[in-house]
Amino acid sequence: SGAEFKYKNDVQKWLDIIRGGYAPKAVEYLKTGTRPPFPYSDIRLLPYLQHSFWFLPNVAACHAMANLLAEKHNTFWRQYKVVVAAGTLAGIGLDALPPVRKAIRSGFDTKTITLSCGKLTTGVTVPQWSSILMLRNLKSPETYFQAAFRVQSPWSIKNPNGDNPNEEEILKPVCFVF
């Protein structure tokens, strides 16, 4: 769809900021050697942003974000497969899940961003999701916590070396809610 943000330049600026660019105090950071941990630029956080869930206000915002992330100048974001799990085309309820699983595959050699305004925020477990960006105002704390729980599910492999059925390798030791 041709969806676009009304304040597209501001949203673009935000995309640049979460990557560590366009920081108003960039000169100060250079002088002091300190820098806040922006999600998509801090090497300590990046491994947990390999598969993220962005919770947006509505279907139009999901499509506008997908379009903006795909724009030619946004080269960083093109390493992520963006899945829009919003609107009638995404299907009802769990029907929105297969495209997400297909994009993630095993989760090791892929990077994904799932855009949603409500679908897949309850009753769904995608072990590879390890971060959620809350990009909307939520009236109910239940909605907030239900969405946050999506990234809290464990991701581990039982018997990773094939020689100890009691051994478990934890692949997702932490998760983040931004």
Locations of the language-model features?
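Conserved C-terminal RecA-like helicase domain
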Residues: 1-116
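Conserved RecA-like P-loop NTPase helicase motor core
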Residues: 77, 81-178
